[in-house]
Structures are given as structure tokens and as C-alpha cells.
């Protein structure tokens, strides 16, 4: 695939871009800060200084805070509770997924990737998380773009970032191989 986006949903939300078959890092090397895309104009203040950033409504930290009002909740608890059908957990995931899909619609409209891969500690949720993301993507993307954009869950789990970084090092033209 020549054009894809990898999105990690964790305590932050970030994206890695492959455009034209090559990693894209932008002029400052900080491309992919999708977590700081404004989703709600009058939303909660974000640590970056803006308001209504995607991370303020859809990061795992926010999910844990919403679900942990009686006792602390981990990402493993979120996965386990969602898979067992807990209605509060499913609602939080549905809301977060819809917001993530809205953010991904902007990326899809802008670069028209062949596929968007979702990863991070919630990757085990598969369709439970992909379905609301897909709904948000389809609702906010140009119809033909939304329909043509593949959306899949990473099979690499929390290893995706490390494997991606290792791949970049191995592809580096200045790397001396022993």
C-alpha cells in the first residue's frame, strides 16, 4: 500500500503517515498530531493550550476517568468490560469512536489513504471500536472518500510502534549494517 495512516489510541492519540510508499514526517518532524485536532469548539482545555482537542474526548485517559468514578479502571479493564457487554463501557467507547471517526474524516478528505489502521491498547476490541469509528468517518468524510477508505484494527497490538520505529532505522540510508 502506498498511502496509509496508522493511528494509536492511548493516553494520547497520534498518527503515523505513509504517503507514496514512504514515511511522511512534515517540515518539523511532528506530523500526525491528530489528538490535537479540534473536535468541539468550546470543549475542555487541553494540555497543549487549545480547547476541544480529540484527546480531551477520546483518549484512554479520558475513558478511564469516565469509567473509574467508583474504582480505578485500566485499559485492560475497558477491553474486558466491553467484551463482556458492560453498557457504560460500550457507551463511552461508542462516543470516543465517533469522535475519532470525525477526526479521521479530515485526514481521509485531505490525503485519501487506502487504509487507516487503528492500534494501541484497545486493539483487542476489534469491531466494538471500529464500528463507531467507521460511523464517524462516514458521517464526516466526503462520501466517496469515506466509502473508499479501508479501516482495520492492527494485529500488532502494542508492538506496532516499536516495529515501525525499527523499520525506519533499518531503512535509513545512513545505517551501517554489520
Predicted segments with their positions:
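Glycine-rich phosphate-binding loop of actin/hexokinase-like ATP-binding domains
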Residues: 1-57
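ATP-binding/phosphotransfer module of carbohydrate and carboxylate kinases, centering on a glycine-rich
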Residues: 42-45, 50-178
Amino acid at each position: 500500500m502506498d498511502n496509509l495512516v496508522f493511528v494509536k489510541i492511548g493516553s494520547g492519540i497520534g498518527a503515523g503517515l505513509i504517503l507514496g510508499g514512504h514515511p511522511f514526517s512534515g517540515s518539523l518532524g511532528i506530523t500526525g498530531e491528530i489528538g490535537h485536532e479540534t473536535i468541539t469548539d468550546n470543549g475542555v482545555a487541553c494540555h497543549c493550550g487549545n480547547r476541544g482537542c480529540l484527546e480531551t474526548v477520546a483518549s484512554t485517559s479520558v475513558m478511564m476517568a469516565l469509567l473509574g468514578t467508583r474504582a480505578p479502571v485500566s485499559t485492560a479493564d475497558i477491553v474486558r468490560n466491553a467484551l463482556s457487554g458492560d453498557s457504560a463501557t460500550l457507551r463511552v467507547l461508542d462516543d470516543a469512536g465517533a469522535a475519532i471517526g470525525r477526526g479521521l474524516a479530515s485526514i481521509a478528505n485531505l490525503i485519501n489513504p487506502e487504509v487507516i489502521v487503528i492500534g494501541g491498547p484497545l486493539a483487542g476490541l476489534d469491531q466494538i471500536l471500529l464500528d463507531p469509528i467507521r460511523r464517524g468517518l462516514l458521517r464526516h468524510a466526503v462520501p466517496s472518500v469515506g466509502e473508499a477508505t479501508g479501516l482495520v484494527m492492527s494485529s500488532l497490538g502494542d508492538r506496532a510502534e516499536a516495529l515501525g520505529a525499527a523499520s525506519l532505522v533499518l531503512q535509513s540510508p545512513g545505517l551501517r549494517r554489520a
